[in-house]
Amino acid sequence: MTTLTDDTKEIDELNTEFIAAVGAHDVGRLDAFFAEDFVSTNPDGSFLARADYLALVPALPTVNNLKGDDVTIRVFDDFAIVHTHISWVAHDGTPGHGRFTDDYAKRDGRWQCVSAHVTTYPHHPVANPSVL
């Protein structure tokens, strides 16, 4: 049986909160969540500093059922890397999928997200749904 460390549990909770905050366009929660030196690499290749990312959040497309799964958390003392698969449904019913990698640093006893890299997958219809 695998036992999660306290740090891993805390980071897993933060990861869940991060996904919920993005889905809700909750700038206030993200503001508290990100380190002052947070940077993001977005699916289009743009590189945004913290303030620019937070300014973008209200304009993100509204999606349904945003969720994360297939989470891997690796903790290295006061640094951690989180890999997560995300999925959602656009308003037109089109499913979306992607992955993100977030980097956390423990500063003054608190885990903060210092970097995010998001990749989205193009939608590929399943040729034979009976194989699922």
What are these regions (language model features)?
Residues 2-32, 37-132:
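A beta-strand edge to alpha-helix "cap/lid" segment located at domain peripheries
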